[in-house]
Amino acid sequence: MEQTYQYGWIIPFLPLPVPMLIGLGLLLFPTATKSLRRMWAFQSVLLLSIVMIFSMNLSIQQINSSSVYQYVWSWIINNDFSLEFGYLIDPLTSIMSILITTVGIMVLSYSDNYMSHDHGYLRFFAYMSFFSTSMLGLVTSSNLIQIYIFWELVGMCSYLLIGFWFTRPLAANACQKAFVTNRVGDFGLLLGILGIYWITGSFEFRDLFQIFNSLISNNEVNFLFVTFCALLLFTGAIAKSAQFPLHVWLPDAMEGPTPISALIHAATMVAAGIFLIARLLPLFIVIPHIMNFISLIGIITLFLGATLALAQKDIKRGLAYSTMSQLGYMVLALGMGSYRSALFHLITHAYSKALLFLGSGSVIHSMETLVGYSPQKSQNMGLMGGLTKHVPITKTAFLLGTLSLCGIPPLACFWSKDEILNDSWLYSPIFAIIAWSTAGLTAFYMCRIYLLSFEGHLNAHFQNYSGKKNTPLSSIYIWGKEASEISKKNFCELILLKMKRTECPSFFSKKGCKLDEKVRNMIQPFLSISYLGNNKTYFYPYESDNTMLFPILILGLFTLFIGFLGIPSNHEGVDLDILSKWLTPSINLLHQNTNTSLDLYEFSKDSIFSVSIASLGIFIAFFLYKPVYSSFQILDLINLFVKRGPKRIFSDKIKKGIYDWSSNRAYIDPFYTTFLTVGMRKLAELTHFFDRRIIDGIPNGVGLMIFFVAEGIKSLGGGRISSYLFFYLSHLSFFLLIYYFLNF
């Protein structure tokens, strides 16, 4: 077994040759390298698969033996300072390694087709492989110095991937925003690392925790300084995991390609912050004020993220705020000391969110042939709807991820989220009420995203994409916006776009659909987009290719079954809770009791309330977002409640307030823009003025003064040597007299 652990160093380094070789190939042999691009993609997936198999082998050994292995090499050794590099294989490392590799393989396989027509295909795979390498290096690090090095590499990769389409101004601004926001957290992390080294004299986790706990228990260190250093360490996690108030970069990060969003939100960028808190939890747990602060940030973030997701029109931004909220649950759990619950939710959320993002990518991919390649249109849920009949596999997978995130049993997130909710009652009733209320909001906005995207009729048919700013036949109701009425006649004519299968073959068929001349004239300005130069014109979205659907289906299976990893179950004295056995060494390090989990019956009984709240959120979403065009009738159930009156006006005000809150991002971004961005620019202008006029002005002024004095003397001398000599001797005599009187 120890021989297997000795090769743990290959985990971060095995995927590294691919980005290096791609970079060298593009520099030295660009044409040949691009011609072999599918081979490089295969190599990326292959090497990451080897790491996944190796990580699974290590995990099985850890479950059976509850072992921890660390290997270090001494790099710098002297009397005052020593630095070691190595790797640490413990349950947290193996869990994160499996998470990164499995999600990474699915995303890379998906990206082969998704990015196939992009000129930056090879650059994309180089960035993605290096991203996985950096994250694997982070989770295997054995000390704080390595953590910081790979932490910065992860940030650099996210900057490159978010700004992958750097020619688009929005993408360029988004990657800069992510970079600058994370600079704040990274600077705090660096100061915290230096402060902890000042206290303990070590960067190694194995020594650091023992020394730190000993100093705290013996009261041999300034508690205020210790708390401040721990707070600085937590600042790094706040920025990386998009926690309040450094969450502003996350929705803008959606400007990158969708596979990047899936990897960032599931297993790399945002997971790095959760990993850091979990890794340093033995340090945080002995400082009660820090634990309380961590839980406070978590509860604020989970509620804020849920409210911001309520009225988003962009499908990816809605999922981004969902990620922010779910990360808040994990931070809350870690702040409460629920180590197992936090990691369990990290696992289940990763697969569910990767499924949702890849599903949204499939939807966006299919919508692009209708509305063009502008993200403002292809990602707009107001232009979707009615996709069930066109993308049934994607719809089923997306529904699976939606129900999982809503907390519906027996899907993955149900088991992990309910553990956090149950633990929150024991920690703080106020926090518990907020967390449970947010569970209902989660079910509402996730169901809203699903309904707007897949149910009803294709709303793109009701918009004019001819390039002229004509009034659309019907405005699309999302929230806070009124839909204009259309006549029943026009509506029925537009419904003819939904052609009978007996009259029209599939859009994959070579035969075109024969439409009535009147209908053809109506839809001509709407839909006239050919797909990638093909002579065939697509009038409807289409299902993605198998290379994109296969990863979605695999992630769907993970979403179905990964929750059974941590189900609390004790059958005839045999503990079937695999996750608890896996985490035994880490839980023992935290001095927590490993036998605190409920049995399956008690857990199911406690979960009734949370499932009821989630069901209520789903019901409200169905009630509010039931498709208006659900039949050939203009009136349906919701229209019975839309008559004008005092209650209607009041409800409109509430909806408008929620819409404004969500669309303006809780007014936090405008606040930062007004008081920070503008303030920093004014400060920069002030310092520039001080530097140019004061700092540079003093030596320049002295030089000018000397110049004018010299010019004056020159004019007095008249250009004659005798005059210059007279002035020289007279001034010399004057200074000699002064010197004489001062010394005698």
UniProtKB/Swiss-Prot annotation:
Molecular function terms, GO-annotated: NADH dehydrogenase (ubiquinone) activity; quinone binding
Membrane topology: Multi-pass membrane protein
Listed Gene3D superfamilies: 1.20.5.2700
Subcellular location: Plastid, Chloroplast thylakoid membrane
Keyword Cell membrane tagged: no
The EC number(s) this enzyme carries: 7.1.1.-
Keywords from the UniProt entry: Chloroplast, Membrane, NAD, NADP, Plastid, Plastoquinone, Quinone, Thylakoid, Translocase, Transmembrane, Transmembrane helix, Transport
The name this protein goes by in its record: NAD(P)H-quinone oxidoreductase subunit 5, chloroplastic
Lineage, highest ranks first: Eukaryota, Viridiplantae, Streptophyta, Embryophyta, Tracheophyta
Gene name, Swiss-Prot/TrEMBL: ndhF
